[in-house]
């Protein structure tokens, strides 16, 4: 039987298999970019998880797909705009029905923009909030619906320095990240007693990416020489650590930074 892509905003990078009994646990990474998001996906795949990754342009998931499948892992890729409620609902439903029960979900979306308050248009502010906070709400809500009957699961949100303090020129980003952090705190207090671990990860430092290397070469080289840039794979290990925590000693927020970062 030939494979056909399904209409609408979601697509599969390969045919879905109807699975009656799924041994592998499912890890969902929403915002699976080339750096941290992909590192998180690889990290969970290495632990035997079936990885479901989503980003707005799912065609860009090819490298992650190849990385995981070359090591014998199972991978599914989607195109998804997490700001659109109907698409998020369909995305979570498709996973639960056709891949397996979601064991851990990571929301890793948030656009970092810098504009003075007078140059921050309502459109820029709203879009930044949609990406970081509203999408997190939509995903958190739909995943929680599935996890609650099982009394089990982990939901992790990626934060930033802006989650805990606002800086000059970052009114939109800080506002959105503060909202995401508050969402995570509220969900943790509500869902924790029901068996669902909710955590927020503050990334307080520059991540080692080609983008930073290209645009800020002097900064990059100085920090790199001092081991002062955050390795995406090392960050990802903390997400796995959060998932593995016993429920008698859960962490609901961690902050990660290089050893030389001022804070």
Functional labels for PLM-detected ranges:
Residues 25, 74, 101-102, 116, ...:
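Active-site loop of short-chain dehydrogenase/reductase
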Residues 33-35:
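Conserved glycine-rich cofactor-binding loop
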Residues 49-63:
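Conserved glycine-rich Rossmann-like NAD(P)H-binding loop of the short-chain dehydrogenase/reductase
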Residues 70-85:
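Rossmann-fold cofactor-recognition segment
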Residues 116-129:
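Substrate-binding pocket helix/loop in short-chain dehydrogenase/reductase
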Residues 154-179, 185, 189-193, 207:
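Catalytic loop of short-chain dehydrogenase/reductase
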Residues 196-202, 220-263:
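C-terminal helical subdomain
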């Amino acid at each position: 039987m030939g494979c056909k892509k399904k209409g609408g905003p979601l697509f599969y990078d390969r045919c879905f298999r109807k699975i009656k009994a799924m041994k592998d646990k499912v890890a969902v990474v929403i915002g699976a970019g080339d750096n941290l998001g992909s590192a998180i996906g690889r990290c969970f795949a290495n632990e035997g998880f079936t990885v479901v990754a989503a980003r707005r342009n799912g065609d860009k998931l090819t490298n992650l797909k190849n990385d995981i499948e070359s090591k014998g892992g199972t991978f599914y890729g989607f195109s998804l705009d997490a700001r659109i409620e109907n698409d998020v609902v369909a995305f979570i439903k498709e996973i639960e029905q056709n891949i397996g029960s979601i064991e851990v979900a990571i929301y890793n979306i948030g656009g970092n923009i810098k504009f003075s308050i007078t140059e921050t248009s309502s459109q820029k502010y709203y879009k930044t909030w949609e990406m970081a906070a509203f999408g997190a709400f939509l995903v958190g809500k739909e995943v929680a619906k599935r996890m609650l009957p099982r009394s089990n699961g982990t939901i992790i949100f990626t934060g930033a320095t802006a989650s805990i303090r606002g800086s000059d020129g970052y009114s939109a980003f800080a506002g959105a990240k503060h909202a995401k952090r508050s969402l995570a705190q509220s969900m943790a207090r509500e869902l924790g007693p029901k068996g669902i671990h909710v955590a927020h990860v503050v990334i307080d430092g520059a991540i080692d990416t080609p983008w930073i290397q290209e645009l800020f070469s002097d900064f990059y080289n100085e920090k790199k020489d001092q081991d002062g840039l955050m390795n995406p794979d090392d960050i990802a290990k903390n997400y796995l650590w959060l998932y593995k925590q016993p429920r008698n000693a859960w962490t609901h927020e961690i902050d990660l930074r290089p050893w030389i970062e001022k804070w």
